[in-house]
Amino acid sequence: MASDEPAKVEEGRRDAQGRLIVSKALGIFFSGYLEGSYTQNFNNPSNGINQLRIFDVNANEFRPNVAKFVLDREADANGTGWDRAGFHVKFNAGKDSQFIGGTNLSPYADFQEFYVQYVLPVGTGLDIKAGRINALIGFEGLESSENPNYSRSWLFGLGQPFTTFGIRASYKFSEQVSFSIGGINSVTSSTGDSTNKLMVESALVWTVTERLKATFYGLFGPRPGQRPGSDGNRVLGGGFVSYQLTEKASMVLEAYYANQERASELSRGGNARWDGVAGYLIYDVNKEWGVRFRSEIFEDAGGFVSCNGTESFPKANVCFGATQNRTSRDVAQTLWETTGTLQYRPVASLLTRLEYRYDKSNQNVFQLGNRATSYQPTLTLDVVYFF
């Protein structure tokens, strides 16, 4: 009985990461958060939609973004047998769930991630994961609270995968270099499309110095086109570099290029190309206050990844001219935006953000009242409660 006492004491408490310890003996943890937001669109679009947004689509109204629940067991590369095994389950409920999951459980609830893990005793440990996992591609991710800003960049929201389903292997060659590669047959993204054909994703992480870190990523394989029978190979390659300027300030620069065969009805060769670059400046005034800035340019040369939404739920990636049943016309465009975010975190369990964003296009894809325009200014208050 005495040997069981320490484990019982720890259960029900939280670890250094704030996770609830469900079972110390089994190494199982529980965590999650609730998020809600309100966005004021100064264009006051008559359809109540923020154009070309993915998750923050509701104009001039409150949005119950997500209730996120996570249950996981971490695999220990230094352990033996059962210690090397792990699992991860992440369930979402709320309006942000539409594009995140891959099981189509319901429009407002789905599993974002569910995978099993085992670290093989090869070298420093060959980490194998199988199931649905957040994609390797991109600096930003699905967890809003882990991104510098509340709203997502177009680089992420329009042009990158959200989650993938398949098998992934990761290996740490040294303290400076690690590599991951995955064979996948399903992808979730803002277009909601998927395929059962094999694709490959990869990421190389290089820690150059304590302050400088670089990540290079890639994706290749067949993807659906805009019309039936127009499937073609997609190639996406790029990366991001982060640099710690001072103890309180850091910056990130991301860029990538993507091309898909037979996906565009606007380009002469039929191929769709999209690319972009984004820069971030992150500054923490103290433990409670911080400011974040983002600026990006995104080009959809083939008119393939932007303006694919309708005015029906989930109302994402919508452009002027869309209706309840159809998208707006295909348009090749160059987009750029600037976002500033003031962050206040009075306690570890509460994150609040006030964000101003200005969107601009070389085409009239945004909506001012009931007419088309080329710009869109918004102001958002976002609140996240961690448990």
Which residue ranges define each predicted feature?
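Cleavable N-terminal export/targeting peptides
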Residues: M1-K8
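Outer membrane beta-barrel
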Residues: Q17-T188, S194-E201, V205-K213, Y280-A301
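Outer-membrane beta-barrel pore domains
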Residues: R53-D56, S97-G102, L212-F387
